[in-house]
């Protein structure tokens, strides 16, 4: 709001909306009036024509001058002074003084090529389409400016008025150029120096030129009004956003400052996320050279899925043999990729071997860094493990010296019974 107030204070009185619209409206109807007067009057050009004199020479007489008895030559009569407009030519001197005649742009005794530039120029000059179009556009532009004072919310009306004023000025200047070209290109018996001294432009012509200048000025002014109204509407919407943000902040929201900083915050957050991702990609931790040990280069997350880990049954049998060598007691079982402690008990060798192999796989699996764990897929393939051999029965204990075993005692008892039985 402070910036809007400061901007309004810096503007002068001529920049006020009402003054600008009023000046544009007055200028539009003034330009339309000047162009209408220029089109309807017959004072565009002052020149001399033979239609107003009474001499024997006519406009089409190009023969040699008549000579008198004294041998002196007679000058050609330049004709009477006339003033002409877009439609008529009027005599100011001679017997036909005050008589106005319609201009004939296509004389019957002259043949014109319909494809020539002179013929097209005469058609445009005879129709006077560009001055008439300029007047119509000026009228429409003035109506649009007047309507913009009623419909102030519709800013496109004043923009359309500015475009109409600029187009009217261009149409006006094209019509003026065509008129000048048609007058300068008219054929005649006079040289260029003599023709320049025998015609001049009148006040109707200058009214048309003034209308062109005024149309361009009010066109620029109308576009300026549209720009100022658009800027004011933008500032008003910004102030409404501030008010809405202030109400949200008073009710527990983030306030207007957070709303205004939202695009820049998003930009900074995006920039920080990009820099952090770039830093993490540049400073990646080192990988191990071997699957089970640290200290070497690691695998890429995209290439780790190409490797498979297999279980070698021969290594598993070696681990089982080492585990069984413990004699059912406490021992150390060494697996293919990690060590597993030997379990107590003679009948648990197979289960201890399976646990040792799984512990070796877990040791390999945990050797990879945690950063690459999310993108790594490890597939373990290989033939199934051979079934564990049945445990050997325990050897019979040796009898103590001087004692007999149960089988020997039984045989001796049978022998004694057989000997002592009476026949």
UniProtKB/Swiss-Prot annotation:
Residue list for modification Phosphoserine: 251, 254
GO CC entries: AMPA glutamate receptor complex; glutamatergic synapse; L-type voltage-gated calcium channel complex; postsynaptic density; postsynaptic density membrane; Schaffer collateral - CA1 synapse
Localization terms from the record: Cell membrane; Postsynaptic density membrane
Signal peptide: none
Keyword set includes Calcium: yes
Intrachain S-S bonds: none
The UniProt record lists the keyword rRNA-binding: no
Principal cellular location given in the protein's record: membrane
Domain of life from the UniProt record: Eukaryota
Region feature (Disordered): 271-304, 342-363, 378-423
Composition-biased stretches (Pro residues): 384-399
GO MF annotation, one: calcium channel regulator activity
Amino acid composition bias (Polar residues), ranges on this chain: 410-423
InterPro entries assigned to the protein according to its UniProt record, in alphabetical order: CACNG_subunit, PMP22/EMP/MP20/Claudin, VDCC_g8su, VDCC_gsu
Function: Regulates the activity of L-type calcium channels that contain CACNA1C as pore-forming subunit. Regulates the trafficking and gating properties of AMPA-selective glutamate receptors (AMPARs). Promotes their targeting to the cell membrane and synapses and modulates their gating properties by slowing their rates of activation, deactivation and desensitization and by mediating their resensitization. Does not show subunit-specific AMPA receptor regulation and regulates all AMPAR subunits. Thought to stabilize the calcium channel in an inactivated (closed) state.
Name under which the protein is recorded: Voltage-dependent calcium channel gamma-8 subunit
Organism of provenance: Mus musculus
């Amino acid at each position: 709001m402070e910036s809007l107030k400061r901007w309004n204070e810096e503007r002068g009185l001529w920049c006020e909306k009402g003054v600008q619209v009023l000046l544009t409206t007055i200028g539009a109807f003034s330009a339309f009036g000047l162009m209408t007067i220029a089109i309807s009057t017959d004072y565009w050009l002052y020149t001399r024509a033979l239609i107003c004199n009474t001499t024997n020479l006519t406009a089409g007489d190009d023969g040699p001058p008549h000579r008198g008895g004294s041998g002196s030559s007679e000058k050609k009569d330049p004709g009477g002074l006339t003033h002409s407009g877009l439609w008529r030519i009027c005599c100011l001197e001679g017997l036909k003084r005050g008589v106005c005649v319609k201009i004939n742009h296509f004389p019957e005794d002259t043949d014109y090529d319909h494809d020539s530039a002179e013929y097209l120029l005469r058609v445009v000059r005879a129709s006077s389409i560009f001055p008439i179009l300029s007047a119509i556009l000026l009228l429409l532009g003035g109506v649009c400016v007047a309507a913009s004072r009623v419909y102030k919310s519709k800013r496109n009306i004043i923009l359309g008025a500015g475009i109409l004023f600029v187009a009217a000025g261009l149409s006006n200047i094209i019509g003026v150029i065509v008129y000048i070209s048609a007058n300068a290109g008219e054929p005649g018996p006079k040289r260029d120096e003599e023709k320049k001294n025998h015609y001049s432009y009148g006040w109707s012509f200058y009214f048309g030129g003034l209308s062109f200048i005024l149309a361009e000025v009010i066109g620029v002014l109308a576009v300026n009004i549209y720009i100022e109204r658009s800027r004011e509407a933008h500032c008003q919407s910004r102030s409404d956003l501030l008010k809405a943000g202030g109400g949200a902040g008073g009710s527990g929201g983030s306030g207007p400052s957070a709303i205004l900083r939202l695009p820049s915050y998003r930009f900074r957050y995006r920039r920080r996320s990009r820099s952090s991702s770039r830093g993490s990609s540049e400073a990646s931790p080192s990988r191990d050279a071997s699957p089970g040990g640290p200290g070497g280069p690691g695998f890429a997350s995209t290439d780790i899925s190409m490797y498979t880990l297999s279980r070698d049954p021969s290594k598993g049998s070696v681990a089982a043999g080492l585990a069984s060598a413990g004699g059912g007691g406490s021992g150390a079982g060494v697996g293919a990729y990690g060590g597993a402690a030997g379990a107590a008990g003679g009948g648990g060798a197979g289960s201890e071997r399976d646990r040792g192999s799984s512990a070796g796989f877990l040791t390999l699996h945990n050797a990879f860094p945690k950063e690459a764990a999310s993108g790594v897929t490890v597939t373990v393939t290989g033939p199934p493990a051979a079934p564990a051999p049945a445990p050997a029965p325990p050897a019979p204990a040796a009898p103590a010296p001087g004692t007999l075993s149960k089988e020997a005692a039984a045989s001796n008892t049978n022998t004694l019974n057989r000997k002592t039985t009476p026949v």
